[in-house]
């Protein structure tokens, strides 16, 4: 998962380098400098915010990578300001966090990428309490049909065609293994 995060981050950096190169080639060095300053500040702030709130390195790396991947596709991915996760979280293993959040976020990215909506956003919330853990991924995608929601976590169920439909079944397996609960709320055309 860290490799995926680095791949997405590298891809985003290359896009930004192309903008800088283009500005220099058209004789706009001042605009290139301003773009560099703005881009690095924005990226630094986003990474810093995630690292401050999410102390578990694998989860923080996943969120940084998914944020970059979403941005490449014109999707805004934000971490709720109230989110927090300690480095020594006892609720799930780092791999379990990455499996659950990675699959939920990736499904949201794929749904939004296929959507014609203008406002494409994903909000991730991680709330770790003394007696509970809440992981929530919300998106402004097309929504999930009621008939599909009932079998969403069954292996092989997918709106994306044959050979798909394993991610959410794995999420269900992890949630069940940790004796948790999973719930889907969706409204057609809303997300």
Predicted regions and their residues:
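Conserved ATP-binding N-box helix of the HATPase_c
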Residues: 21-24, 94-117
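Short alpha-helical Gxxx[C/S/T] motif in the catalytic ATP-binding
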Residues: 167, 171
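A short beta-strand-to-loop motif within the catalytic HATPase_c
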Residues: 184-188
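Conserved short strand/loop->alpha-helix "switch" segment adjacent to the catalytic nucleotide/phosphoryl-transfer site
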Residues: 51, 77-100
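Acidic ATP/Mg2+-coordinating residue in the GHKL
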Residues: 139
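Detector for a conserved hydrophobic position within an alpha-helical segment of the HATPase_c
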Residues: 175-176
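Short conserved segment of the HATPase_c
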Residues: 144-155
């Amino acid at each position: 998962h860290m490799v995926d995060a680095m791949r997405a981050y590298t891809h985003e950096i290359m896009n930004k380098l192309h903008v800088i190169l283009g500005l220099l080639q058209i004789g706009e060095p001042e605009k290139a400098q301003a773009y560099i300053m703005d881009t690095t500040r924005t990226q630094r702030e986003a990474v810093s915010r995630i690292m401050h709130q999410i102390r578990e390195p694998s989860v923080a790396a996943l969120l940084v990578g998914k944020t970059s991947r979403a941005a490449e596709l014109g999707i805004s991915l934000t971490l709720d300001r109230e989110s927090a996760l300690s480095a020594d979280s006892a609720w799930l293993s780092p791999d379990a966090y990455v499996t659950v959040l990675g699959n939920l976020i990736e499904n949201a990215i794929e749904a939004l990428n296929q959507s014609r909506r203008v406002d494409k956003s994903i909000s991730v919330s991680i709330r770790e309490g003394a007696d509970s853990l809440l992981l929530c991924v919300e998106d402004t995608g097309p929504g999930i049909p009621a008939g599909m929601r009932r079998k969403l976590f069954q292996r092989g169920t997918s709106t994306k065609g044959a050979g798909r439909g394993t991610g959410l079944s794995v999420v269900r397996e992890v949630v069940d293994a940790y004796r948790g609960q999973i719930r889907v709320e969706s409204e057609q055309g809303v997300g």
